[in-house]
C-alpha cells in the first residue's frame, strides 16, 4: 500500500506534506498544504488534510477533506478515528465500506458562543487525549 501511496504522492507539489495513518482499520494517506511546525521536514502538524484510501481493486480513491480551526486544534487521531476541532466544535471521522471506502462523520458537536453542551465538553476532553498527526514533506516511511 505504501508503495502505491508513494507513487501517488509524486503528483503533489513541493508544498504538500504527507502522513500515513490507520483509520477505522484501513490504511490511508493524508495530504496537506496547510502545515505548521518548527522544522521544515519533520514534526509538522496540519490544519486541514485530504484523505486518500485504496478500494478493493487497489486503486486510490479520494475520501474527502477535513479542517480544524487553528493551530490549537491540529488534525489528530484517537481510537483509529480522525479528529478536528475549533473553539466551538469537535468532529470525529471514520471510514466505512469495504469495496469502495467512504469517509463518515462518526460524531459532531458544536455550540453557540456562550453555551457548551455536556457532549461537546466530553468531546473536547477526548480531543485533548488525541495524538496530533505528524506530517512530513518526505515520504520515506
Task: Locate each region found by the language model.
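Terminal domain-start segments
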Residues: 1-25, 118-141
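Surface-exposed loop/turn elements that mediate protein-protein interactions on large endomembrane-trafficking
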Residues: 1-7, 47-65, 93-107
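Short consensus segments that form the blades of beta-propeller domains
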Residues: 8, 37-44
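Short, exposed beta-strand/loop patches in secreted or surface proteins that constitute
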Residues: 16-22, 52, 67-78
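Acidic/hydrophobic-patterned starts of short beta strands in beta-sheet-rich repeat architectures
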Residues: 21-35, 76-83
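Short glycine/acidic-enriched loop and turn motifs that connect beta-strands
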Residues: 35-39, 89-90
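Polybasic, low-complexity, intrinsically disordered segments
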Residues: 42-45, 57, 87
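Acidic, small-residue rich beta-repeat scaffolds with periodic aromatic anchors
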Residues: 72-141
